[in-house]
Amino acid sequence: RFIDTYTDAHPVFRKSTQRLHSKYHHYAGVIVDLFYDHFLAKNWSTYSDENLEEYTETFYQSLRDHYDILSERTKGMMPYLIEHNWLLSYQTVEGIGRILTQMDNRTKNASNMRFSSNELVEFYPEFEEEFTIFFKDLQEQVSLKMQHL
């Protein structure tokens, strides 16, 4: 919860969402979250010594092992997540586009998220720079939080 709250309030994250808000309204934050996931996956080796493929499989196995305690929302999403290997597909713009389309198909309102990968391509350097700044700040905040636990 700390990370979600921190992310939503961060000025750089908000700057990224403002770029999309007029077209995607309240879905802008969800979209930027996925864009940032893309940059994390793309640059995974910068942030982790563990191979992304190994991390992904470990994560999926953890979901399977702890299925009984997962939220209903997570349980509902889990088959799509694993079957389409969402975490690994975050590495590519095409993978993000597929995920956005799948999410768009499942929204009740007309979100048009399926089209937002166009903005990812159009503003790629800007989003990547914003992610890099944001993620550095997030790592520092998490480190501070961990020291106080």
Positions of PLM-derived features:
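N-terminal leader/auxiliary helical segments
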Residues: 1-149
